[in-house]
Swiss-Prot record:
Organism: Arabidopsis thaliana
InterPro entries: BACK, BTB/POZ_dom, POB1-like, SKP1/BTB/POZ_sf
Recorded metabolic or biological pathway in which this protein acts: Protein modification; protein ubiquitination
Keyword presence, Transmembrane: no
Coiled-coil ranges (or none): none
Domain BACK stretches: 233-327
Full protein name: BTB/POZ domain-containing protein At4g01160
Domain of life: Eukaryota
PROSITE patterns the UniProt entry points to: BTB
Domain notes: The BTB/POZ domain mediates the interaction with some component of ubiquitin ligase complexes.
Ranges where the BTB domain occurs: 111-180
């Protein structure tokens, strides 16, 4: 038999007076006036659980392991602090008689408006509990009055009763009788409160083996911050984030109603994902704004949530300059926050590709806050340089990775983010085409006018397509022309580089520089 107190099986000693040296009275309390909450949605469920947790925290005293003794009453009150969790322990002198069930109502009420619903008494071994929990070790060995007492009273909230009893049994047996995920989460939380690391690890391992659901993943991410930081819990919370990110990976298949019903931790998990498939970061931002406005009606509250919680997950450097300009003139953020975010984004856009890679390298891959990393955008980000005189014109830079180009074979396309020229919305489209004269596949580039503009709008544009090439690394002109655009129309070149597809994708192709194809479009309005 393993005689190690930290790892042995001592279930035979649980609540057995022959193997115990102390009596633990557990007072089950409940705040007066607390009503029942009926949860009708996922967000209500998550919020009610958090509210319940905060209520338990608020009705106990803040603690820094201090002692307030009253020698006349022959008792003292110990309050222990474990991160954000507070546990109140009343230690009573051994010679003091336990209170009978006939105590009056005033004695049944604590001084912080909580009532004692019931009392359980357990015979405990201080050695076993101290070996499992630094909380109990400090309680039994601090050299003060309470460490010498044979009876102590532990006050817990009614919502914690089952979990605390399971925890105490675990400290003797290294096993749990509960199997439901919600019950294991409750045990995990009280194990954190009483610093029973072995139970935290045990609960996490059991939960990791269970099928993840949206409800369970949201509850995991809504755990207290101190618990989320525990090493034994991190694999569990990482799995919860990955589950939510995978479930909402393709945003085009998710209804807006479903997104709006998610709590804050759910939205954060979605936004933190690099693999989020969405048209552009502009669309990500619009979704975030809708969510914030649906959950926070007060402007100041929206600004606080956006600035303190959600901004870290938004990839502002990959938003269009038009959208960044709107952020500066809107009240979405506090002015100082908006300026900082937009300036940082614009500076990133102007950096060389090499320096952008340096900034990306400085971001931790495991971090949930990745400001510079691209997502799996349906519409690829661009760089744009605009001129107002002598006539409206712009230079568009579109970079495509070799794998992205290979993915459009034999007949697909990649579209860029929208940009504005002459008051109209345009986009670039890289395509794999069939050259009908030579009957070969080839790489083509087109410019198109958005279909959501005015039906009568028309604008004449001079366009010039070029591509960067080895060995000079300069842009070389490939195709140019003049075209009068109307809504939904596009123009371009089916074989921009004048070579077959297999030569274009070959390793020695001069147009791929470090496996990146650099395209440029010079556009100007003909007045």
């Amino acid at each position: 038999m393993d005689l190690s107190l930290s790892g042995g099986d001592f279930r035979f000693a649980f609540n057995n007076v022959n193997f115990s040296d102390r009596l633990l009275r557990i007072e089950i309390t409940q705040s007066s006036g607390e009503g029942e909450v009926i949860c009708s949605s996922i967000v209500d469920w998550a919020r009610d659980r958090k509210r319940r947790r905060e209520d338990v925290t608020n009705h106990t005293n803040d603690a820094t392991c201090h002692v307030e003794s009253d020698l006349n009453k022959n008792s003292c009150e110990i309050v222990n602090e474990n991160s954000n969790n507070k546990t109140q322990v009343l230690v009573t002198a051994a010679e003091q008689e336990p209170k009978s069930g006939g105590e009056d109502e005033n004695e049944r009420l604590t001084n912080n408006n909580t009532s004692v619903l019931s009392v359980q008494e357990l015979h405990i071994s201080s050695a076993i509990l101290a070996a499992k929990s630094p909380f109990f070790y400090k309680l039994f060995s601090n050299g003060m009055l309470e460490s010498e007492q044979k009876q102590m009273t532990l006050k817990i909230d009614a919502s914690e009763e089952t979990a605390v009893m399971e925890l105490l049994k675990f400290m003797y047996s290294n096993s749990l009788s509960v199997t439901a995920s919600s019950a294991l989460l409750d045990v995990l939380m009280v194990a954190d409160k009483f610093e029973v690391a072995s139970c935290m690890k045990y609960c996490s391992q059991l939960l990791l083996k269970m099928p993840m659901t949206l409800e369970s993943s949201l509850l995991l991410l809504d755990l207290p911050s101190s618990l989320l930081m525990a090493d034994s819990v991190k694999p569990l919370t990482n799995a919860a984030r990955q589950f939510i990110a995978s479930r909402y990976k393709n945003m085009s298949k998710i209804t807006m109603e479903e997104l709006m019903a998610l709590p804050l931790v759910g939205i954060e998990a979605i936004l933190a994902s690099d693999g989020l498939e969405i048209q552009s970061e502009d669309v990500v931002y619009e979704v975030v704004l809708k969510w914030v406005k649906s959950h926070y009606s007060v402007l100041e509250a929206r600004q606080e949530v956006l600035g303190s919680h959600l901004a870290r997950y938004i990839r502002f450097p990959h938003m269009t300059t038009d959208r960044l300009k709107k952020i500066l003139t809107s009240n979405d953020f506090r002015p100082s926050v908006a300026s900082k975010l937009v300036v940082e984004a614009l500076f990133f856009k102007t950096e060389s590709l090499a320096h952008q890679h340096v900034l990306l390298a400085h971001e931790q891959p495991a971090s949930t806050s990745r400001r510079f990393a691209k997502r799996a955008y349906v519409h690829r980000p661009i760089k744009i340089v605009e001129f107002a005189v002598p006539r409206p014109q712009c230079i568009i830079y579109l970079d495509l990775k070799r794998k992205e180009c290979e993915s459009i074979y034999p007949s697909s396309r990649i579209s860029s983010q929208q940009f504005t020229l002459g008051g109209q919305g345009f986009f670039l489209s890289a395509q794999c085409n069939m050259d009908h004269l030579c009957l070969i596949h080839c790489f083509g580039l087109f410019i198109g006018m958005q279909e959501n503009g005015s039906a009568s709008a028309s604008v004449t544009v001079d366009y010039d397509f070029s591509v960067r090439s080895k060995p000079t690394m300069e842009f070389v002109g490939k195709f140019k022309g003049i075209y009068t655009f109307t809504r939904g129309k596009a123009v371009g070149c089916r074989n921009l580089l004048g070579i077959p597809w297999d030569i274009f994708t070959a390793k020695n192709c001069p147009y791929f520089i470090n496996d990146v194809l650099h395209l440029r479009a010079d556009l100007s309005i003909r007045l």
